């Protein structure tokens, strides 16, 4: 690696720590020639291929996942940091599964599973785009599904209290 300021190849790592929200290692480096400091990020290259709806494939891109989740979570109780953390968690799940390919359908289902436990509004917003509801009936069905799961949680909490 070369210094971005003077192009000298002699560098020293002065600090190294995990940047968990980015699935990376953050390193502070110092040039041994000009003594300027800069930061680098070391990331794992995830080589999962995503099969799109039209049948084509592209490399998994975490920023696309973040953008989709952020759009669904806009104006909800979920912060941008939580969106980044959720995307990192999903990326970790992909890496641990050691799969080579995943469809956008599978990614969408994975995102919906996580969103459902975080915020029902974000879940419905994501579902509207991901499932491409054709009419209000399909939207109503999705809302009923999430309401019944919330009621099941409430009932189990009440049973535990009694």
UniProtKB/Swiss-Prot annotation:
Record's cofactor remark: Binds 1 zinc ion.
Gene Ontology BP terms: negative regulation of DNA-templated transcription
Source organism, top-level taxon: Bacteria
ATP-cone domain residues: 48-138
InterPro entries, per database record: ATP-cone_dom (IPR005144), NrdR-like_N (IPR055173), RNR_NrdR-like (IPR003796)
Zinc finger (unnamed) residue numbers: 3-34
Functional description taken from the UniProt entry: Negatively regulates transcription of bacterial ribonucleotide reductase nrd genes and operons by binding to NrdR-boxes.
HAMAP family to which the protein is assigned, alphabetical: NrdR
Entry-linked PANTHER family: TRANSCRIPTIONAL REPRESSOR NRDR
Protein name, UniProt field: Transcriptional repressor NrdR
Annotated organism of origin: Protochlamydia amoebophila (strain UWE25)
């Amino acid at each position: 690696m070369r210094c971005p300021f003077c192009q000298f190849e002699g560098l020293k790592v002065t600090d190294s720590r995990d940047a968990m929200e980015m699935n990376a290692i953050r390193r502070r480096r110092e040039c041994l020639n000009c003594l300027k400091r800069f930061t680098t990020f070391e990331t794992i290259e995830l080589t999962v291929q995503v099969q799109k709806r039209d049948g084509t494939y592209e490399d998994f891109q975490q920023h696309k996942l973040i953008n989709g989740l952020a759009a669904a979570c806009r104006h909800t109780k979920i912060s941008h940091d939580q969106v980044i953390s959720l995307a990192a968690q999903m990326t970790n799940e992909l890496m641990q599964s050691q799969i080579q390919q995943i469809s956008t359908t599978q990614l969408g289902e994975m995102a919906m599973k996580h969103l459902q436990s975080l915020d029902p509004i974000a879940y419905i917003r994501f579902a509207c785009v991901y499932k491409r509801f054709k009419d209000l009936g399909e939207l109503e069905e999705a809302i009923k599904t999430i309401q019944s799961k919330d009621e099941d949680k409430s009932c189990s909490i009440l049973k535990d209290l009694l």
